[in-house]
């Protein structure tokens, strides 16, 4: 049985780390198989059941993308970001993406990879967990805490209470 607190406690973790938490009695191989099935189902489900976006997300991303490059780095599985962007009508606003499911690398390395691949000279990472803050630090870029999200930050360079504060 899983409760809301379990979901919040697992936000930002890789799918395999979530699997270890949810299924501690399974072997690593059994856990991998279960999580692969969950990830496939989740990606398929998301195509026809897009998530609920924060207020004005589409308008804010459209506005920001006219002046700045928008990039997404996540600890999610392969395909999740693409499906999410497509199902929510946001694909046109994002220039590049990377995730743990594609590379098997920690988020900090994936952030660094996106920065290098896109020749970014000035950037910052917006996230809502301490793990996001640590990943931005590992990549050597400033971290802005999205306080409306799931977690806390210790020393962000800035804090936003809503997505609209980025415009």
Mark where each language-model region is.
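A metal-dependent, Asp-based hydrolase signature
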Residues: 9-45, 63
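Short beta->alpha linker loops
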Residues: 10, 52-56, 76-77, 102, ...
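Alpha-helical elements of Rossmann-like donor-binding domains used by nucleotide-donor carbohydrate transfer enzymes
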Residues: 17-21, 37, 59, 63, ...
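Short, acidic loop-to-helix structural element flanking the phosphoryl-transfer center
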Residues: 32, 44-72, 78, 82, ...
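Asp-based, Mg2+/Mn2+-dependent phosphohydrolase catalytic module
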Residues: 29, 78, 82-167
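Short, small-residue-biased leader/transition segments that mark boundaries at the very start
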Residues: 2-4
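A short acidic, helix-capping loop that chelates divalent metal ions and anchors anionic groups
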Residues: 18, 42-46, 80, 151-154
């Amino acid at each position: 049985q899983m409760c809301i607190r379990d979901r919040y406690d697992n936000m930002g973790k890789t799918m395999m780390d979530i699997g270890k938490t949810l299924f501690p009695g399974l072997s690593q191989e059994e856990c991998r198989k279960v999580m692969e099935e969950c990830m496939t189902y989740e990606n398929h489900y998301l195509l026809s059941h897009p998530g609920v976006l924060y207020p004005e997300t589409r308008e804010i991303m459209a506005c920001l993308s006219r002046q700045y490059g928008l990039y997404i780095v996540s600890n999610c599985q392969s395909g999740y970001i693409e499906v999410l962007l497509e199902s929510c009508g946001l694909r046109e606003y994002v220039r590049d993406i990377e995730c743990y499911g594609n590379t098997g690398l920690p988020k900090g390395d994936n952030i660094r990879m996106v920065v290098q691949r896109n020749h970014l000279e000035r950037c910052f990472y917006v996230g809502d967990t301490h793990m996001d803050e640590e990943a931005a630090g590992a990549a050597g870029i400033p971290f802005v805490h999205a306080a409306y999200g799931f977690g806390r930050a210790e020393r962000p360079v800035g804090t936003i209470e809503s997505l609209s504060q980025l415009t």
